[in-house]
Amino acid sequence: MSEKVKPYKESELGKKEQVKQMFDNISGNYDGLNRVISFGTDVKWRKKIVAFLKEKSPDSILDIATGTGDLAIAMANTGAKNIVGLDLSPGMLEVGKKKVANKNLQNTIEMVVGDSENLPFEDNSFDAITVAFGVRNFENLEKGLEEIHRVLRPGGNFVVLETSVPTRTPFKQGYKIYTKYVLPSIGNLFSKDRSAYKYLSESASVFPHGQAFNNILKKIGFIGIENKPQTMGVASIYVASK
């Protein structure tokens, strides 16, 4: 389902290449725009992930679709000794590397270019794996999740933060109006890539959230699966283990 929506409808490139191009294009103002369009709530959601993982005391964490490194940097507070932030977009990673350096976290966090559907790591490599606002951008969702399951250690924790669609009135109607009209308009004003924020809202609307995503995780082989709706259902935090 998530494969049907691509950033650039006129492009002949595959979804993966288009997503890489899109995030390279918007990397310069991505952080600021995220704070604006989410009213700062994305920061609170990430703090919940950090609090959850801190209780698990992982030594190693892989943050997939790390972007500019917000979650990877925040997870330094978990006490993890080794955090790898992986992303398709060199442009996003360049911003992230500067943020890591500004926090003096170069010895803890490594930022690497990589593909979530072909992870450059051995089996059972990480105590925890996270993806924030990234799984809906996978070209092949199940293949990406299979790779995550492969490199996660037995007993390790997998945490996903992803947008979802509210089901209750009036939040459902308000969400549709905001994502269809307001979010793309904000993107048009502040981003040089007019298609990017339209894609981000469209991809969120078709992503298999809630129980549908739980079922996919179960199919892949994850256990202990839970999803926790956030802020009236506009996002969800999914937790699972191997």
Kindly give the residue locations of the regions a language model identified.
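N-terminal auxiliary segments of SAM/dcSAM-dependent transferases
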Residues: M1-K20
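C-terminal alpha-helical "lid/dimerization" subdomain adjacent to the S-adenosyl-L-methionine
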Residues: E17-Q18, L88, L161, V165-I216, ...
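Conserved alpha-helix/loop element of class I SAM-dependent methyltransferases that forms part
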Residues: N29-G32, S38-D59, A74
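Hydrophobic beta-strand segment of the Class I
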Residues: Y30, I129-T130
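Class I SAM-dependent methyltransferase SAM/SAH-binding core
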Residues: S60-N118
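A short acidic, Gly/Pro-enriched loop at the edge of an enzyme's catalytic core
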Residues: E117-A128
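A short glycine-rich, Lys/Arg-flanked "PGG" loop and its adjoining helix->strand segment in the class I
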Residues: E142-N157
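Core SAM-dependent methyltransferase catalytic element
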Residues: N214, I220-K242
